[in-house]
Structures are given as C-alpha cells and as structure tokens.
Amino acid sequence: MDVGAFALPLLALLGYSLTRLPQPTAQDIEQKSSRVTLNGKQRKELFIDFMPFLVLLFVANLMLVVLRDIKEDFLVKIIDMNGQSSWMFAQVDTVVTLIILALFGAMVFVKSNIKVLVALLGLVVLGTATMSFISFNYNSLQLDAITWLFVQSLCLYIAYLCFQSIFFDRFIACFKIKGNVGFFIVTIDFIGYTGTVLVLMFKEFAHADINWLEFYNILSGYVGLICTVAFTCSMIYLIQRYKKEKQLKKAKEAEMSNGIKFTGEGMEPTTFSQI
C-alpha cells in the first residue's frame, strides 16, 4: 500500500504531462513518420511484409515471458535467501531497473533509427547469451545467490523490456511505417500472456517434486540460447532489409533527378520515352 500511495501521484503527474506534449513538428514527422491507426487489412499487410522478423521476435518474447513468470512466481523456491532481508529482492530489482533506464534513456541521443535498433538488439543478444552462459555454468562459476539473481534479472529484463518500450517506436520510424506501436505492443503482449497462462496452469496443477534451481537454470540456459539465435537472425534481417530499402530509395531519387521511371524490378529503369 505504501508503494502504491507513493506511485499514484507520480502516475497522475506523468499522465497530465502527456496531455501537455506539443504537437509534432514537420521535422518530427520527417524523422519518425506520421502515426495513424491501422485497420485489419493494414495490420495483416504489415505483418506479412515483415513476417520473418516479427515471427522471430514474437516467439522469442513468448519464451522470455514464460521464463520471467517462472522466476517471479517461484523465486523463493529457486534460490535460498535465508538470512537475507525481504527487501533484498526489491533492492536488486531497483538497481536493475535503474541500469535499464539509463541504457534505454541514452538512446535518445542517437538520432539514427537503424543504429538504435541494432544497438538494442545487440544489448538483447548480449543479455540472452550471458543468461545462457551463467545458467549452463552455474556450478563451475559458484556465484552467490544475490549475484546470480542480479545477473539473471538484468539479462532477462533488458531483453523483455526492450520490446515493451522503445524498440517498435524506432522500428516504425526507421522503415517509415504508416502505423503506430499499438499493433506491435498488443500482439506481443497477447502472445506473451499466453505464456503467462501456461505458467499459472503449471503452478496450479503440477505438484511434482522439482529441484527448482536446477530446473530454472536448464530452462533459462536453453531459452537464452534459442533467443540469442533468434535475435541475431532478427538483427541480420533488419540490417539487410534496411540496406535494400535504402538502395530502392536512392534509385527512386535518381528517377526524379534524371527523368527516369523506376520499375523496382532488377533495379533496371524504364525511360519515359519507352512508355
């Protein structure tokens, strides 16, 4: 209740601040593209257009949500916190949150959308790879409970929160998509909460005697490994797609300056005299 009483005025202040934001300037629209609501047909076309990329992100996010829910719901069974204050969990999460806020906040100073997207995916890949490494090597590393919890939380939440905050905003701006982040956030949340339901069902109906630390390390190790591959492939796709669209844009600019009609097929133009 104390936390809620402290957070409520801040939430109200932030909500009021959002209503006072100025309208986007022409430069803002040029850098980030205009944001409009998509209908069903447009959402389908957008998904098909970026399907390989989005499928990788959605599937990886599902696994991250399942791992996050297991960590939060079964944490007291996973690690031994005897002798530690009950505030230790909150302190670890606070430090993790501040680090992530600093990392994501620093992206404001980077104007290039593709650089931000690559940097974010790079952070995510680093996080999932580190999570997998410390999970598979838990016995040899011999980390204490607090260090293990801190590293696991930092790696997991960097990957999870990236797609709940700034990633899709920069994605829309980078590829000049006529839409908004609502479609992406709602879709990724829907898929993620499907994983949450599975975890809750497991919690209610599974009564097996499980070594939770061993189970979690195995699960986080494989989730980290799969997500590392998925996000690396996503980053490669993103870079290649951006280069391709940049080439198409240059060809269209050449069309305008040279009086040539761009066909978009094979990068071969057709002159107006041939029409």
Residue ranges of model-derived segments:
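Conserved extracellular-gate-facing transmembrane-helix segments in secondary transporters
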Residues: 63-71
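Short amphipathic helix-loop junctions that connect adjacent transmembrane helices
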Residues: 70-87
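Transmembrane alpha-helices of Major Facilitator/SLC transporters
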Residues: 85-113, 127
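A membrane-interface helix-boundary motif in multi-pass transporters
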Residues: 1-6, 201-229
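Intracellular loop-helix junctions on the cytosolic face of multi-pass helical membrane proteins
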Residues: 1-57, 72, 81, 110-112, ...
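Intracellular juxtamembrane helix-capping segments at the cytosolic ends
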Residues: 75, 159-175
